[in-house]
Amino acid sequence: MVYFVGAGSGAADLITVRGMRLLQQAHVIIYAGSLVNPELLQYAKTDCEIHNSAKLTLEEVLQIMQEAQAQGKMLVRLHTGEPSIYGAVREQMDALDAFHIPYESCPGVSACFGAAASLNLEYTLPGVSQTLIITRMEGRTGVPEKESIERLAAHQASMAIYLSTGMLRELSRRLTAGGYAPDTPAALVYKATWPEEEAYICTVETLAWVAEVHGITKTALVLVGDVITHGSYQKSRLYAADFSTEFRQAKSNATQTEEKQEKQCED
């Protein structure tokens, strides 16, 4: 049995409880050594067989999986962040299907959510944005034209842009070409939730400058949108007094006034 486990965004204690237990039970672990916090390997058994996939090809990873299955061993494939986002897991799953090897997935905390926690952000502020776009610049892996930065920027939604730290000048140019103003709030978060995390609030126009000043060349996430400065937004209707839910009846203006008067009398 193979388990694809999300390691979380960086901090070792951000792995899920289920993910931690799977690591504790595994006979074999293949981890993404270039990005996964090595502290997570402390959960492994003393006799666990551990492989660093940064040094392996896809074929070599699959060979280890086949050998573990043949020996009746449980294997954890430990991916950085959340495996379903830029995790290259589908090609492994398709191969396992061909080999008739069963597998399951265990989610993890992706970097965009780790970064939001570090900055105390809400991506979906009423009156500002109700959409989060997760994307990347094209590099050695292409991006469909319909998902270009310019087309996505036209939505003026909150954006989390992965794998683009080395292309920040081009990214800024394309974001503004798509409709963002140069002074639109942005953030550059290096190694979100890791002990060495660095986070900087800037603008779309100053992204590259901030990276250069602080020597950030890789492993950073770019966030874009007015939610970053949260200066003007509407309160959620969910907790409004005149809003009914399954658990609470709306109060009329008269009822609210009476309650205020009663409270004033009590005071």
Q: For the regions a protein language model found, what residue spans apply to each?
A:
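Class I SAM-dependent methyltransferase SAM-binding "motif I" and its flanking Rossmann-like core
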Residues: 11, 82-155, 198-201
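A contiguous loop/helix-start segment that scaffolds small-molecule binding in enzyme catalytic cores
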Residues: 2, 60, 71-75, 131, ...
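Active-site catalytic pocket residues across diverse enzymes, especially alpha/beta-hydrolases
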Residues: 44, 119, 175, 179
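Short secondary-structure boundary/capping segments
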Residues: 20, 42, 67, 124-125, ...
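Structural recognition of alpha->loop->beta junctions
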Residues: 26-27, 95-102, 126, 207-216
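Class I S-adenosyl-L-methionine
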Residues: 1-109, 114
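A generic local structural motif
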Residues: 14-18, 38, 62-64, 120-121, ...
